């Protein structure tokens, strides 16, 4: 299965402020995620990302209503309708494959991103780099021992001053 990591980040690689706020990110990032997710048909989140998005004001989860959505959690979480639970990256991918998917998006948080990278499960990386720098924050990857080499596929200025960087993982 092809696994695509896609994240909206600050210029210095943060996905959220120290307290979890994503207010520095443009709404264009969400729209781009929704468009990609609709093309692929599914995505994987960690429990903390699921919890954070569930608390956003508005009906953001309606944007992904028809998609297969997996939340990875070591402690079973109460999920809203349309989400399924998995206990590991491999379990999440197995559940999506069983539903006929051959591609999946992962989009955080840091711990889940690191677990996929550590297991060498990521095939492509898309970073939407926002024009902000955070002194403190939550990085794309939590501190874990792994090395993933990348080859730049494309770079493009998209909405506003956001730059999309696309990489393929080299093995």
Regions found by a protein language model. Give the residues of each.
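Enzymes that bind and transform nitrogen-containing heteroaromatic metabolites
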Residues: 1-171
């Amino acid at each position: 299965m092809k696994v695509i990591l896609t994240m909206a980040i600050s210029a210095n690689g943060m996905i959220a402020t120290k307290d979890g706020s994503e207010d520095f990110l443009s709404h264009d990032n969400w729209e781009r995620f929704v468009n990609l997710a609709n093309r692929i048909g599914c995505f994987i989140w960690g429990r903390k990302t699921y919890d954070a998005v569930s608390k956003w004001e508005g009906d953001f989860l309606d944007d992904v209503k028809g998609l297969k959505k997996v939340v990875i959690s070591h402690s079973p979480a109460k999920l809203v309708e349309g989400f399924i639970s998995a206990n590991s990256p491999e379990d999440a991918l197995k559940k999506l494959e069983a539903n006929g998917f051959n591609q999946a998006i992962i989009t955080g948080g840091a711990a889940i991103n690191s677990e996929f990278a550590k297991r060498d499960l990521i095939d492509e990386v898309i970073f939407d780099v926002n024009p902000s720098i955070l002194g403190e924050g939550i990085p794309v990857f939590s501190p874990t021992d792994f090395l993933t080499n990348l080859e730049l596929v494309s770079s493009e200025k998209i909405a506003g001053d956001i730059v999309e960087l696309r990489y393929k993982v080299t093995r």
